[in-house]
From Swiss-Prot:
This is Ubiquitin-conjugating enzyme E2 variant 1A. PROSITE patterns: UBC_2 (PS50127). One of its GO terms (biological process) is positive regulation of protein polyubiquitination. SUPFAM superfamilies: UBC-like. Has no ubiquitin ligase activity on its own. The heterodimer with UBC catalyzes the synthesis of non-canonical poly-ubiquitin chains that are linked through 'Lys-63'. This type of poly-ubiquitination does not lead to protein degradation by the proteasome. Mediates transcriptional activation of target genes. May play a role in the control of progress through the cell cycle and differentiation. Probably not involved in the error-free DNA repair. Expressed in roots, shoots, leaves, stems and flowers, but not in pollen. It comes from Arabidopsis thaliana (Mouse-ear cress). Heterodimer with UBC35 or UBC36.
């Protein structure tokens, strides 16, 4: 039996539980983190991530919040990744905050063994590249989270 045939494919939910456990323990130097967005999400689809802006870049001193959505095909297919915090970066749609797969090779060339941690670390490295590191960022007063794409929440006051 070759090593290819012996490779075990870990089911989606077990894989996500492994990622959750790793995210809760903390990652590397602490400049990226992630976890479940909603503890009641039994399908483990909605995740939140954080990247601390790297030093000596236009992102320094800022905390960037992201949403990652792992559809039913994850980890065979990549999650969708969207910055909640406004950011000016070559691979990010400035209107929606979506990380464009066509501009972020890791998503275009997705492999099953990649993780959400890998995405966050790669985005942080992307912030440090020559074409991103000096990009002017949105003004300070503009750090509020992006509006929910589902529209405003409706509320009643009685």
């Amino acid at each position: 039996m070759s090593s290819e045939e012996a490779k075990v494919v870990v089911p989606r939910n077990f894989r996500l539980l492994e990622e959750l456990e790793r995210g809760e323990k903390g990652i590397g130097d602490g400049t990226v983190s992630y976890g479940m967005d909603d503890a009641d999400d039994i399908y483990m689809q909605s995740w939140t991530g954080t990247i601390l802006g790297p030093p000596n870049t236009a992102y320094e001193g800022k905390i960037f919040q992201l949403k990652l959505f792992c559809g039913k095909e994850y980890p065979e297919s990549p999650p969708t990744v969207r910055f909640q915090t406004r950011i000016n970066m070559a691979c990010v749609n400035p209107e929606t905050g979506v990380v464009e797969p066509s501009l972020f090779p890791m998503l275009t060339n997705w492999r099953r063994e990649y993780t959400m941690e890998d995405i966050l670390v790669k985005l942080k490295k992307e912030m440090m590249t020559s074409h991103n590191r000096k990009l002017a960022q949105p003004p300070e007063g503009n750090e509020e989270a992006r509006a929910d794409p589902k529209g405003p929440a409706k509320c009643c006051v009685m």
